[in-house]
Amino acid sequence: ICIGMQILFEYSEEDNTQCLGLINGGVKKFQSDSNIKVPQMGWNKVISDTDSLNGYYYFANSYYTDSNDYAIGHSYYGKKFNSIVKKDNFLGCQFHPEKSSDIGEKFIKNFINTI
């Protein structure tokens, strides 16, 4: 969840930190401009080929990961970014399911039922 997803990648721009390296790529900081405020705080849409994942979730993040082969959900906040990644038995989400009402509860239950 949130930074837990980010540490699955190779590195983070936050304090130039090396991460676990389980997923190729890095974590980058959103750049504030007239269209977006950093951090992203609030509801944003997740788009996935898996219908049960589609919907609005609660985000609180200043950093994002680029799309890659392991993205199973993405969102837009000034640019397209990964909102859900899955590799082998690792699953990460950039949003906070615990703050995402019914859809977040469903996400957590589905995750638990897959392990």
Model-derived segments and spans:
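Cysteine-nucleophile active-site neighborhood
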Residues: 1-38
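Amide-donor transfer/coupling interface in amidating biosynthetic enzymes
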Residues: 26-115
